[in-house]
Amino acid sequence: MYQLNQIPSETQIKKYIRRIVFGKNVFCPLCKGRRVMKQQNRYRCARCRIRFSLLSHTWLADMKLSYQKFWMLLWSWTIQVPIRQAMVLSGLSDDAVRRWYTRFRTHLPEEHHILERIVQLDEAYFKDHCLIMGKQKGTRKLAWEVLRGTSPNRTHAVSFLFRKVKPGSKLWTDGAAIYKGISRWWPVDHARDIHKKFEFAHTSEIEGMFGVYRTWSRRMYHHHWSINLEKYVREFCFRFSSPELFNSPLFYLSKTLSLMPID
C-alpha cells in the first residue's frame, strides 16, 4: 500500500473514530456506564464486564483491514477514485474493493425529495430495467425509481407523481404515451417536448442527468449488472444532491458511524 499525506496515522484515525462513536469519554455500549478499563486495543466494563472495542458495536465490527488501508479506501470512494485505481493504491483485489465501495454506499443516509415548482421527468432503459427520474429545474433535487422491465405504463408514472411531486407543480416531459393526460390523475400543469419535432427545451436538464450517470458509472465502476441499478443510482443521486457528505472520510463517518442498538 502506498503512503500518502492525506492518509492520517493509525493513532489519529482511532482518535477520530473514538470521538465519533463515543464522544469525549468512552462508555459501555450495553449499560452506558463510564467505568471502563482499557486492555491493549479493547475495553472492559467494570459494571457488566463485557469487552468491546472501538468498532465492535458498529457496522465496521468485522473489519479486517488496517485502519490506514480502510481510510485509504474510504478516501478513494469519497473522491470517486475508479475501482481499478483503488486496487493499485490499496493492493486489494477487485472483489475486495467492490465489497468496500458497496458497504460505504449501503450506509449512506436515506434521502427523499419532494419535487416542486418546475419538474422535468423522463425515463431511461438499462437492459431489463427502467429508471424513472425527475429533477426540480435549476436545483440539485432529484427523485427516482427503478422498475423491473422495459415497458413502464401510466400507472408507474402516476405512482411516481403521487409520492415525489408536489401538487400544483409544472411538469415537463417528452411526448411518451405514459404521460398523456397525466394532469387528470394528479394536479400538475403538464407540458411536453416532441423530440421528433426537435423539441428539447423542456427536458434538457433531466436528459443530461442520464448521460452524466452513464459516464460516471462507467468511469468509477467500469461496469455493473442491471440488477444492481438501484444501488448505483442511489449513490449517484446522493452525490449530486448532497455533495457535502463526500467532502472527506471524516465527515462521511460522522454522519454514518454510530453504536448499533443492543437488544
Feature names for model-found ranges:
Residues 1-263:
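Residue-level recognition of single "structural anchor" positions
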